[in-house]
Amino acid sequence: MSLVKSLRVTTTPKDEDSESYISREVFYDRNGNEIAVHEYRGAGEFESKVETKFNEANQVIEVTTYLDENDIAERKVYIRNQEGKVEKVNIEFTDGTVSVQLIERDAENRTENRIERNEDDELESREFIRFNAEGKAILRELYDFNDKLTEAFESEYNSDGEISVLRHLDDRRKLILETEFKYSDTGSLLLRVSRNRRGDLSDFLKIEYNDQDQVVRQSFSGKYTFVYEYDELGNPIVEEEFSGDVMDNRITSEYDANSLIVSEDQLKFSKRFEYEFYD
């Protein structure tokens, strides 16, 4: 299979008064990395633009987001150490101001302190992260420009290294929300349940799978349901979206011999996917 160089998505509204337009363009390097993504909400109507640069190890070294086709909203340049870990981020904003984020780690790489300061060396924000022996985050604390805690997250993991409990805490470290995760024997997520500090149910996600461990049904708090069908190659060919018993959308997809999506039909519009390949 040839390497994809670019993807262009053309959207055609089913409203007779609307014209087809290019809704998304994605550009790739020879390693398959997305180096640019352009999105449009209508014919010539800019929505977003992101450009990304990578080093020889396929690690991100620069990300630029745009306000419009030409004006930069934010640019981040990532400085990495010999191990490839980010130790400094230079940030440029649309008004020309800059800030710097320094990432401090202990000798065992069990903690990270991410400190962002503006060009006047004033604190903008701070993020503290603690890791377990397997390198998974077990504590994440966010601080404001006064170095005051704004919120925190505590994580627990099961014996397979999958997150089992996530707690969201407020600025006084009191519980806002506790989320539990349940998995199948194959490690697929079956249930995610969130409860507030009183133990009242906030929301849940229930997922069902077929014999190939593909998602066939997702239910969000019993209010929104997504149902999926697949072809013999495992490509999703039908997705149905429901609010209660009412179908909100039905998406049917077609693929080429390489399992690249080439068309998508929805209730209100259709999409055509066109590819350019490297020689």
List the predicted regions and their residue ranges:
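Buried hydrophobic residues that stabilize the cores of well-folded domains
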Residues: 1-279
